[in-house]
């Protein structure tokens, strides 16, 4: 789900917008907390860059980052989910994939297949912004008042693959599961 969230958000952005500051809302952190989701660690009121937000969606699988990116690019969660499902149709996978939220929270109306996830990942890797995020081994956010040293995110999966098989064998990835 979060790869599609990244893709839909990134398609509404450009490289110049990556440095733009976004304030983390209480709604974003509450959504993450109430749904017992993984979080990037952004705090209410924290001013982060769009690039920080996008990396926060993927590397630590941050629900608050996904929520905030959805609101930032589409205005409401409902509109963002509509945008996600329009992208599903564009990719030709609407028979077996449908999204009901930008985070991947379990819902019978939020479903996909492994094959469709590969289609989504392929589309994301064709987007320059997405490719940069999905292929990052490590990323440190910009310094903020709440995190003076920034927050360092690491792709445990890509780093493990690099250690075992050598760098460059896998160029982009996102792990995830639903209980």
Name every feature range the model reports, one short phrase each:
Residues 94-95, 106-179:
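Domain-terminus/edge residues, biased toward the C-terminal soluble/receptor-binding domains
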């Amino acid at each position: 789900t979060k790869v599609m969230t990244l893709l839909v958000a990134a398609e509404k952005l450009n490289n110049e917008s990556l440095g733009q500051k976004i304030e983390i809302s209480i709604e974003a952190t509450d959504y993450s907390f109430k749904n017992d989701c993984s979080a990037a660690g952004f705090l209410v009121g924290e001013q982060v860059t769009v690039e920080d937000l996008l990396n926060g969606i993927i590397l630590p699988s941050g629900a608050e980052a996904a929520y905030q990116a959805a609101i930032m690019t589409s205005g409401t969660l409902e509109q963002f989910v509509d945008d996600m499902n329009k992208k599903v149709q564009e990719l030709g996978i609407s028979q077996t994939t449908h999204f009901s939220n930008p985070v991947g929270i379990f819902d019978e109306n939020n479903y996909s297949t492994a094959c469709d996830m590969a289609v989504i990942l392929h589309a994301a890797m064709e987007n320059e912004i997405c490719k940069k995020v999905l292929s990052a081994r490590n990323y440190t956010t910009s310094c903020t008042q709440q995190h003076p040293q920034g927050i360092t995110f690491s792709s445990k999966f890509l780093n493990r693959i690099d250690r075992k098989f050598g760098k460059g064998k896998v160029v982009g990835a996102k792990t995830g599961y639903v209980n």
